[in-house]
């Protein structure tokens, strides 16, 4: 069955290449998505869930919520009030953080990724389209070690500061945080998310920030 499905995928991709209606990037993304689905032993029919089962799943979720009474059931953000309202971050949720420029959006999402990866040991992928991975790690080290970032930039550090920095560096280095500053398009981010999920089992994806993402001409609106 898997071989037949693979043959069907390759036939469809070949036809799309000959038709030339989609650009190369879109075809590559679709190819990867279809083959990844085969690797996960999934296909369109097995993804179908009867409405009755969906209703039961929803009722079970509501029943579980009534038992937990607002306790965090997803990935905690570290912000008490936010966790109470959301009960954590859950699979398939898309949450947008919106604010005026220079209001601390990057710092906010970085704190969430930091808490999830360092405090709760979740696998987190953070895509940074503005800051380099080195810049982000430097900010994380300043936060975790409680050493002034300006002192880190100038190198004006005491022995005690170095001890704190090394402790912070060890915590970050042993975590499941993935920082990627190379993906710039929607297709690249999707592709890497699939790979990171398969390889590292990521539970949270953070993108900073959406306006800097680019897309292929045929999928720019998406």
In which residue ranges do the predicted regions lie?
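Helical mechanochemical/support elements of P-loop NTPase systems and associated helical scaffolds
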Residues: 2-9, 13, 20-27, 31-34, ...
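Cytosolic-facing regulatory segments adjacent to core modules
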Residues: 115-201, 215
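P-loop NTPase nucleotide-binding/switch module
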Residues: 64, 68-89
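Walker B catalytic acidic pair
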Residues: 209
């Amino acid at each position: 069955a898997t071989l037949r499905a693979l043959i069907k995928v390759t036939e469809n991709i070949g036809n799309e290449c000959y038709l030339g209606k989609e650009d190369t990037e879109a075809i590559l993304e679709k190819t990867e998505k279809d083959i990844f689905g085969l690797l996960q032993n999934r296909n369109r029919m097995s993804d179908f869930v009867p409405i009755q089962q969906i209703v039961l799943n929803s009722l079970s979720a509501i029943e579980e919520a009534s038992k937990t009474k607002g306790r965090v059931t997803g990935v905690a953000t570290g912000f008490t009030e936010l966790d109470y309202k959301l009960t954590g971050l859950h699979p398939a949720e898309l949450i947008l953080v919106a604010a005026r420029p220079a209001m601390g959006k990057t710092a906010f999402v970085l704190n969430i990724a930091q808490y999830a990866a360092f405090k709760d040991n979740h696998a987190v992928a953070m895509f940074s389209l503005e800051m380099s991975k080195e810049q982000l790690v430097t900010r994380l080290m300043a936060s975790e070690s409680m050493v002034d970032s300006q002192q880190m930039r100038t190198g004006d550090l005491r022995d005690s500061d170095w001890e704190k920095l090394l402790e912070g560096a060890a915590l970050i280095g042993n975590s499941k945080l993935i920082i990627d500053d190379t993906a710039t398009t929607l297709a690249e981010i999707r592709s890497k998310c699939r790979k990171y999920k398969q390889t590292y089992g990521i539970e949270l994806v953070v993108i900073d920030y959406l306006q800097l993402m680019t897309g292929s001409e045929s999928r720019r609106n998406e």
